[in-house]
Amino acid sequence: MDLDAKFGVCRFPKKESDGTYRRYEVGKTPKSKTAIVTGELDQTLKSYILAMRTPILYDAFIRSLVIWTVDASGQLFYSFEEFSEEFDSKLTCVASLNLKYISGIKCLKLGHPTLLNFEEARATGELAIAPPEDKSVDAYINGRSGRYCRGDKTRVPTVRQLQNVADLFSSAVGLRFKARL
């Protein structure tokens, strides 16, 4: 199988302007990080998506975000986007899309590079829940990742590569996923 064609070429995440990675992310891994195992049904993600597609939860959590990445070997990982710091020993707060501050404290989110410990990725992006009224699909994926994709069109997965990832999710979760730019 040609992984370059299926998911894109491997690339490292971009570094900050000073040549380093974000210090608050180095050495951190999201607690919700999960590997999609071919042939096994991921009930956690399935339950989450089905719950979030109900009107009351969809409206309340529309901005919640799941991030995903495909590593060099073609393995798919995902996590809920989490804050860097723990609020207590049992809970890592899940971040909301574009959330920058809580009560004046800057939110430091764990991004795509933390899913692979800053190693190479083939494709990265976000998973968004489809609105309850959309009966054709349960979730969408895109190829948005600031450090793996932003600023260089050659780093962004193609629609075909994104659909290949969507197909992996569909197979593992038992729901309908669709690629969306």
Listing of model-derived features with the role each one plays in the protein:
Residues M1-L181:
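Eukaryotic phosphoinositide-binding membrane-targeting regions
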